[in-house]
Amino acid sequence: NSDMGAVEGVRKITGREVPFVQVDCCDYEAFRKVFEEYEFDSVIHFAASKAVGESVQKPLEYYRNNLTSFMNVIRLMREFGRHNIVFSSSCTVYGEADKLPVTEQTPRKPATSPYGNTKQMCEDILRDSLAAYDGLRGIALRYFNPIGAHPSALIGELPRGVPQNLVPYITQTAAGVRECLSVFGDDYPGFLIAILPPG
């Protein structure tokens, strides 16, 4: 999460000053300075644009950001001898699966959005890089809208803008940011959960 409030929340929770560098991962030279300045063993790569709908409206921005930043990570890891990467992929790599629920053995289908395409391409780049470069180790995690918050509520799911999926609407309503949560449709299995703001 690139929100400075999240960085401050981590500092409060840990009671430590946490190094934070704001850099465009697509800017190779600027990103390179991070690798020069800091010692670390592993990279967890979350830096990506992630709104499926927006990716349909702005496909070139998504391809540029998500692919360039990931390739820069791999290039810099090789240059500086960093060997371990965890890649934040997405369940969108499954496309329109033939069978639900999907498992890790479910074959990938064509993605249904530019965002999904970028995640498939990054997985391919990771696979090919692991095969080509000795010592490089990595894994891709295929998330399904991860949610949650620290018990202190200093960090977690409470977006400030317009949410892109249901859970942020629920948390905003529970936190009193939204007055109510409207649920539309009539094909729910016999129950409806009302979410009311505190008080």
Regions found by a protein language model. Name each.
Residues 1-149:
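N-terminal Rossmann-like NAD(P)+-binding domain of SDR-like oxidoreductases, especially those catalyzing
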Residues 127-199:
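NAD(P)-dependent short-chain dehydrogenase/reductase
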